[in-house]
A protein has these predicted regions:
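Short aromatic/hydrophobic "clamp" motif used to bind/position activated sugar donors
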Residues: 170
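Membrane-embedded multi-pass helical conduit in multi-pass membrane proteins
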Residues: 25-47, 56-62, 68-71, 338-429, ...
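N-proximal low-complexity "stem/linker" segments adjacent to membrane-targeting elements
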Residues: 1-97
Length: 513
């Protein structure tokens, strides 16, 4: 395995060098085209290629954790939360059953936000311990550590009441994530290093077959979980992921519990790094959960994530950076980079399209786009971009991730809206991703794409009326720009599958590889 990884790294060095040359060959002719449209296109490409170059740098830094036998005698609590009405009992039952089967002595806890009778009965039947803060006024605050209706408030109530005093290790698992029986045996050994505060593993989905959106979510997350996180492991700074992870209670207590923020996992990562703690990353699939299966859930989730990441990056990270080691600064700087680069690049492309439709195609731009250096460089970049897929753990292949590309084209307006929310300091509040029933018929979330199509269409018609379009390129660009929006609007009328499908869950009853 080590030999194969080193061999792939050597090839990555060669291909990265080729990509740098190809990037120059693609961008420089556009710069010399001497037109605003060409410069905007060059800017968008430079932003996207810079992000790609960072990912290729991560390929060279990938480090693998080694299996370490678990230390016997640890007091371990395996915990999940539950919000009645937003999360289904059949889904919860599979998660609790999986938690009970973990191969290390532990207590399983359910943190029930609603003190639900059916959840209490389920816990009694499975032998799971039940906790609810519903009747505890001291754990029901409007803001802060115990904010009502939030995951961090729910966990912090249990930690203060029970967890910190009675356990050495917290294994936190979201209610839709079914752990494999090896979840604890694969992770607890990493805590034998007293510097390690937390252990992470990749986030995978068992409902990928449910829809195009679910498969796209899996594709677009692979670079992060199988490349970036493994590179950060080398420096002891992988990101905490809220879906499932293991924490040393002593370290978590020193942080004050889960961070009171929508991006509690990112903020907790930065707090750990600022305090000198390290993390470990086990690059093996140890649990599988649910991905969004419909457009509304997906774009709302992405906007919420982008808003929380931007808030941490712009307002909290600058205050924390002075006390951080270099590795912590890098984590804080690079987290959310994809959201930002996609939004800014899309904005540059939108302005370039407007210039094409209004002012026409400069001869220098048409010549540059059809030149051999640009065409050759674009082909090289497209084909070599497949190589990082060989680092994607169980998903190693050389296929195009077109679904992930489609999702990126769909979500960029919501990324810019998230950026606007943060700049205006608009608090959109905490929102839970519902994992019960089917998507509603509400399509109000489509308005950004309806406006995009309307603006492009109106400008296109006006340009043709005025006779400013004398080249095929503006027509092709206008159609290409509207296609993702039209696809989103049209496909939103196709009935979406249920958020939770018992058959898919049972098909991945054990997440071990």
């Amino acid at each position: 395995m080590k030999f194969q990884l080193n061999g792939r790294r050597s090839m990555a060095v060669l291909l990265a060098s080729v990509r740098v040359v190809a990037a120059v060959g693609l961008i420089v002719p556009l710069l010399f085209a001497a037109s605003v449209t060409a410069w905007l296109l060059a800017c968008a490409l430079a932003i996207l290629l810079a992000g790609s170059l960072v990912r290729w740098g991560f390929l060279l830094l990938i480090d693998e954790s080694h299996f370490i036998a678990s230390t016997p005698g640890l007091r371990v609590a395996v915990v999940t939360s539950f919000v009645p009405g937003a999360e289904s009992l059949p889904m919860l039952e599979r998660t609790l059953a999986g938690m009970q089967k973990l191969c290390y002595p532990h207590d399983t806890w359910l943190l029930d936000e609603g003190d639900d009778d059916a959840a209490i009965e389920l816990c009694a039947r499975l032998g799971v311990r039940h906790f609810s803060r519903k009747a505890k006024a001291e754990y029901q605050t409007e803001q802060g550590q115990y904010q009502r209706g939030t995951k961090h408030g729910n966990y912090n109530a249990w930690l203060s009441e029970i967890g910190f005093a009675n356990y050495d290790v917290l294994a936190a698992i979201d209610p839709d994530h079914v752990p494999g029986s090896n979840f604890l045996t694969e992770t607890l050994g990493q805590l034998s290093d007293p510097r390690i505060a937390y252990v992470q593993s990749p986030q995978e989905y068992y409902n990928q077959p449910a829809s195009l959106i679910a498969r796209g979510c899996s594709e677009e997350s692979r670079d992060f979980y199988w490349i970036s996180q493994r590179a950060f492991h080398r420096f002891g700074s992988p990101s905490v992921i809220g879906a499932h992870g293991v924490h040393r209670m002593k370290a978590l207590q020193a942080m004050g519990g889960l961070a009171p923020h929508i991006a509690d996992d990112l903020l907790l990562t930065l707090r750990y790094q600022m305090s000198g703690w390290r993390g470990a990353y086990v690059a093996r699939v140890l649990a599988r959960g649910l991905a969004p299966v419909d457009w509304r859930t997906y774009v709302k989730q992405q906007r919420r994530w982008a808003t929380s990441l931007f808030d941490v990056k712009f307002f909290l990270y600058p205050e924390m950076v002075q006390g951080m080691p270099f590795r912590g600064r890098v984590v804080g700087l690079l987290q959310g980079l994809t959201f930002l680069q996609d939004g800014v690049a899309a904005l540059c492309c939108a302005m370039a399209l407007a210039a094409l439709l209004v002012a026409g195609v400069p001869a220098s731009l048409a010549s540059a786009l059809a030149s051999p250096p640009v065409l050759t460089s674009a082909t090289i970049l497209l084909l070599t971009g497949l190589y990082p897929h060989l680092f994607h753990g169980p998903h190693r292949n050389l296929t195009f991730h077109w679904r992930a590309g489609l999702l990126r084209l769909v979500k960029w307006p919501y990324t810019l809206l998230a950026l606007a929310d943060v700049i205006r300091r608009r608090d959109r509040g905490y929102a839970l991703t519902a994992k019960v029933g089917r998507a509603t018929a509400d399509r109000s979330f489509l308005w950004p794409h309806v406006i995009i199509c309307g603006l492009i269409g109106a400008t296109w018609i006006l340009a043709m009326t005025l006779g400013s379009i004398q080249h095929l390129l503006p027509h092709v660009a206008a159609v290409a720009a509207m296609l993702p929006s039209l696809f989103l609007v049209g496909s939103s009328f196709i009935p979406a599958p249920a958020a939770f499908d018992p058959m898919l869950a049972d098909g991945h009853a054990d997440a071990e590889l």
